[in-house]
Amino acid sequence: DTGYDGAGATVAIIDTGIDGAHAGLDDLDDDDATYDPKVIGFYDPVNNPSLTNGTEVFPYDDQGHGSHCAGTTAGTGAPTYEHIGMAPQANLVGVKVLDAGGSGSFATVMAGMQWTVDNRYQFNIRAASMSLGGPGAIEWTSSEEASVNRYGNAMVLAGHPLFILAAIY
């Protein structure tokens, strides 16, 4: 235990969304008498690409993986407190780049990365997590690979530790 609980920081989860009503992700102190939402922003280029200010869509996850990642990162552990995230006092921003089937396009992933960089000050985003993968090797064009490198570098240069896991299953 390092004593760090994530207080004052926000982590962007770039994935299938975040269930804003989940008991371990709905508020910072798990006290229904206080209004202190844990998920403070949400962008959905999959189903709501024109709603870009981060507060127009209630956070949702129609697949589940993004909520799992959010819980591992910053879940409070409610209701049983058996499994608490690494930074339970951190806020979250959900960036939904994958659909209900867990699939997505290069365009929505790039839109999500760009939105995260563009909104880093508004939401105090200090780190970003992308845990994306698929059934085979990713075959990008050279321009797509250059875009991933450019946006990844932009995120790191903007001060975001970027955790990317690309799994092949």
Predicted feature residues:
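Subtilisin-like serine protease catalytic core
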Residues: D1-Y43, N47-A107, Y121-A127
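Substrate-binding/access-modulating region of protease and related hydrolase catalytic domains
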Residues: D5-A7, T76-T80, G94-Y169
